[in-house]
Amino acid sequence: ADRKSLLINLGGGVLTDIGGFAASTYLRGIEFINIPTTLLGMVDAAHGGKTGIDFKQLKNQIGVFNEPLEVLLDDEYLKTLSKEEFINGYAEVVKHSLLTDKPDLTFNSLIKLDLFKDSDYIINSYSSVKNEIVESDKYESSIRKILNLGHTIGHAVESYSYISDKVVDLKHGQAIVIGIITELYISHKKFNFPLKDVVTVKEHLKNYFNLIQLEEDDILNIYDLMVYDKKNEGSKINFCLLYTSDAAD
């Protein structure tokens, strides 16, 4: 391969993250395209130019911003997935629905859809939510930070599952669901985000995900991992919190 080579990343979110990072650093950068094969990749991970790898059980500690030449979407790949892997990507769909103010894409509109029958519409519609945000803030200096809803806690929970004997190897989506619900509750306590909306989101997600119970020592260990979150500023742990269903801070 040389500097004019093109790397094709065909696979799920982990593969497009690693492949994008490899392309971005090989010979100081070659072009790449992403062809995501999971719902998670199609609506979120393959878009936006964030590339990276985990380091010492910590999420995305090494990486760069570099957008792919193209992201090619084909929902036929979803037919190859187990039901569990298919659903894994739904956490990011719900996140996007909570961040948009477009009436036909809000959470209340999303829950009227059938995840499996309406997958093509869901992929195209909710990936566009992320792409529009990224287009206005490619390097996450301002508005793009809202895409981290659920991820400060979610990434720490996911990292904890790598090292814990009690919470073992959670999928990304399941960890992010825990993060979304918890950060919505923090939004309620801090900014008076409606508690009834927190409950509605939680009850809906319970239809798709097994919400694990965390004990006090688990929570303390997860907090310790949050200290390493890449969004932090000094000793300050940063969250994306909501005032309403269409506004984030």
Spell out what each predicted region is:
Residues Y243-D249:
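Conserved small/polar residues in nucleotide/adenosyl-binding loops
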